[in-house]
């Protein structure tokens, strides 16, 4: 299912309140985790471990049921999804828009259920989730030639599995905004470490790290559909809306002559894994 997870999130419009500033640290504020945060982490970890061993086909079946619940029970994600689809696809009938919204909500839930495969399995198990590949050879050839590469990985399909597979064997650098829970942050750092991906903070220092990586001929990964901080974006027309859009990619692309690719991991039917597609 190709629907983007970002269609389930609110586009930052001109009339929205300002987003919080990005801090100068890659780590969450130093604080002892509370009992509630520890319990929350243990529940999340148990969930991830369970879903890491369940078959994809079963996870997608469960995702279909939970996605249906998200569609019929009033909630913010469903309302936002319908609003965004109406703005992006005004020519579709109400029934067609609703069908697309339900597919998107199902995809959103399936992505959450798949994270155990991305975060808990050994890297070999994560990479084995990919069963089909299209267009990756061109990216690998450029990267191995020592040319700088900018890889855009939007919230489409399963972006975590895509990132690990596309960057396997390539010196790679990604920006990372840590979660508030320090234990979850430690888990995710370990996940990135197993793949060899280097992390850059989401601030000026991080931008400098990415620029340096491009100059060394390495790969830089960016999730282009994230809402930037106040200093990192401009308002641009997007399906009739004035949406706050990051400028980082254009800034990176103007430094030197990096090659720009984008891609995603498409969810295959019947739990047959993922197809990595790169353009």
Please provide the spans of the model-predicted regions.
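Membrane-anchoring hydrophobic helices of lipid-metabolizing enzymes
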Residues: 11-153, 185-187, 194-196
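Soluble catalytic domains of membrane acyltransferases
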Residues: 111, 116-279
């Amino acid at each position: 299912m190709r629907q983007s997870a970002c269609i389930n999130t609110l586009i930052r419009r001109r009339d929205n309140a300002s987003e919080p500033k990005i801090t100068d640290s890659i780590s969450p504020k130093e604080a002892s985790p509370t009992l509630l945060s520890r319990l929350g982490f243990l529940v999340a970890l148990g969930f991830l471990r369970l879903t890491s061993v369940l078959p994809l086909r079963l996870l997608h079946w469960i995702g279909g049921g939970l996605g249906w619940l998200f569609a019929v029970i009033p909630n913010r994600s469903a309302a936002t999804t319908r609003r965004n689809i109406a703005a992006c696809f005004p020519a579709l009938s109400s029934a067609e828009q609703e069908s697309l919204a339900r597919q998107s909500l199902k995809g959103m839930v399936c992505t959450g259920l798949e994270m155990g495969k991305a975060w808990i399995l050994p890297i070999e198990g994560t990479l084995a989730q990919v069963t089909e590949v299209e267009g990756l050879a061109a990216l690998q050839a450029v990267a191995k030639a020592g040319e700088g590469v900018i890889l855009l990985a939007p919230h489409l399909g399963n972006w975590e599995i895509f990132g690990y597979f596309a960057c396997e064997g390539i010196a790679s650098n990604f920006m990372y905004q840590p979660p508030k829970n320090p234990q979850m942050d430690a888990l995710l750092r370990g996940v990135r470490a197993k793949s060899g991906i280097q992390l850059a903070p989401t601030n000026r220092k991080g931008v400098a790290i990415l620029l340096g990586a491009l100059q060394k001929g390495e790969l830089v990964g960016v999730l282009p559909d994230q809402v930037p901080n106040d200093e990192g974006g401009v308002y641009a027309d997007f399906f009739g809306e004035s949406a706050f859009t990051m400028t980082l990619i254009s800034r990176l692309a103007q430094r030197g002559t990096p090659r720009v690719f984008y891609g995603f991991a498409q969810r295959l039917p019947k739990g047959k894994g993922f197809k990595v597609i790169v353009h």
